[in-house]
C-alpha cells in the first residue's frame, strides 16, 4: 500500500463524513423552510430512494444483491438491521435535528461508539482499557456540558432533542453490530441497500407515503435530492471505497469530520448560535471517540479470536 493510496483513502473518507454532516444541515434547512415536511416523510423518501439506487448499482457491478434473500436467517438479519439499526440512526437523528439543530444532534449521535463499548463490556465481558475508560469519562463530561451548560439542576436543551439524539446514538451501535456477520459474505452495497430499502418500505406502517401530500418548491426538492444523493449514496460509496486503502480505525477517526462539518455549515449558513459549553462539550466527545478509535485494535483482535474459535 503506497502513501498515495493511503492519502486517497483518507481524502475519500474525510469527504464522505463531511457530506454526511452537510446532509444534516440540509435537513435542518428543509424543516425550517417547509413545516409540512416531517422527519418520518424525509426518512422514508431518503431510505427508499437511496436503497434502490444502491441496489441498482450493486446489480450493475455484479454484486448479486438478491443472493442475500436465499437464506431465511440472512433475510431476517437484513430486516432487523433496517428496522433496529438504520431506522433509529436516520429517523431519530432527523427528529433531533427538527426539534434542535444539526450540530447538537450530530454530536449526541457521535456517542454511539461508547454504547458499543458498553455492550461488549456487559455481554462479551471485554473489560474497558484505560484509554477507553478515559474516553468514556470525557464523553460523559462533554455530554453533561452540552445538556446542562454547567448548571446541573436544569437542562439547556429540550428533553425531546436529548431523547431523539440518544436513540440515534443507540442506532449507531445497532447499525454497526447487527449487519456485521453479513458484510464479509454479501458486501456493504447489498447489505446497506437492502437495509435502507426494506426499512423505508416498513415505515409506511406509521405514515403511508401515498397518503402524505407535501408540496415542495424547486429549491426544497433540491435539498431532498442533496440529502439522498450527496448525503447518502455518494458518501456511502466513497467511505466503502476508502476502506480499501485505510484501516477501519483510521476511518473511524475521520468520522470526526461529520459533527465538525455540521457545526461549521450550520453556523455559516443557518446562523446557529452555539455556546462555549456546546463547543467544549462537542470537542470533548470528538476527542473521546478518537481515543476509542485509536484503541480499536483490541476489538479487532477480539473479532479475529472469536472467528477462529467458531
PLM features: what roles do these ranges have?
Residues 54, 128-150, 265, 277-296:
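Hydrophobic transmembrane alpha-helices of multi-pass small-molecule transport proteins
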Residues 61-103, 145, 228-246:
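Specific transmembrane alpha-helical segments of multi-pass solute transporters/efflux pumps
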Residues 5-10, 35-44, 68-75, 133, ...:
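Juxtamembrane helix-entry segments on the extracytoplasmic side of multipass membrane proteins
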Residues 17, 45, 86, 90, ...:
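Helix-helix packing/entry segments at the starts of transmembrane helices
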Residues 30, 42, 46, 96, ...:
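Hydrophobic/aromatic residues within transmembrane alpha-helices
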Residues 10-14, 72-80, 128-140, 161-162, ...:
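Cytoplasmic-side transmembrane-helix entry/capping segments in multi-pass membrane proteins
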